[in-house]
Design a protein with these regions (language model features):
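Class I S-adenosyl-L-methionine
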Residues: 1-16, 21-24, 28-122
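A contiguous loop/helix-start segment that scaffolds small-molecule binding in enzyme catalytic cores
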Residues: 6, 96, 164-191
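Generic beta-sheet signal
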Residues: 35-36, 64, 127, 147, ...
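Short, charged, surface-exposed secondary-structure boundary motifs
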Residues: 43-45, 72, 135-137, 181-182
């Protein structure tokens, strides 16, 4: 029996109209849908996707326990269990679609599972979604870059990388816990 494919599908930043046609097609064509969390309706990625693909609620739904913790052992254990759960379906020839916020290639939970699944011999594919920072710029009606400007996408927790004195546009990802410092650094840089 041919093994299934694990798809990491970005569902965009929150507006179901921003889901890509490919994301919608991949979700529609496959019967097993995975997402981080236990209850579908409490998971942001599921809530976005089900608005664009209402038939999603009738599919096989896999809520995967992927806690938001900094404990490396707990993370490794949860990711291993989630990958094994997905692999069980792949081994039966079923494709599995893992829903992730934004774009599947930018700070996505799926990329950790992707590595584990590939190590198990499974095929994976990433399906792009609209990144939150692109949607925010469009919502504000401002370009991220013009002409030869530089665009820097930086994790806000990496203080060494956040040098706001360099020219260009900065996108500081994962800034929630670091917002006070980001504001202070921005003010110090005259922004």
């Amino acid at each position: 029996m041919e093994k299934g494919i694990a798809y990491g599908v970005g569902v965009g930043p929150g507006d179901p109209e921003l889901m890509t046609l490919k994301a919608v097609r991949i979700i529609r064509e496959n019967e097993v849908i995975a997402f981080p969390g236990g209850v579908p309706e409490e998971t942001a990625a599921y809530r976005i996707a089900v608005q664009a693909v209402p038939e999603l609620s009738a599919k096989i739904l896999l809520g995967l326990d992927l806690p938001m913790t900094r404990d490396p052992e707990a993370l490794a254990d949860a990711r291993k269990k989630a990958a094994e759960t997905i692999a069980a379906h792949l081994d039966r020839g079923r494709n599995v679609v893992f829903l992730t916020l934004g774009d599947a290639t930018i700070y996505s939970t799926f990329t950790y599972l992707q590595t584990l699944l590939q190590d198990m011999g499974h095929r994976t594919e990433l399906v792009n979604g609209v990144p939150s920072f692109c949607a925010a710029a469009a919502r504000l009606n401002v370009p991220l870059t013009e002409d030869r400007e530089t665009l820097r996408v930086i994790p806000a927790w990496d203080e060494a990388a956040v040098n706001l004195r360099e020219p260009g546009t900065y996108v500081l990802m994962k800034s929630g816990q670091h917002l006070a410092r980001v504001k202070k650094d921005s003010a110090a840089a005259g922004l």
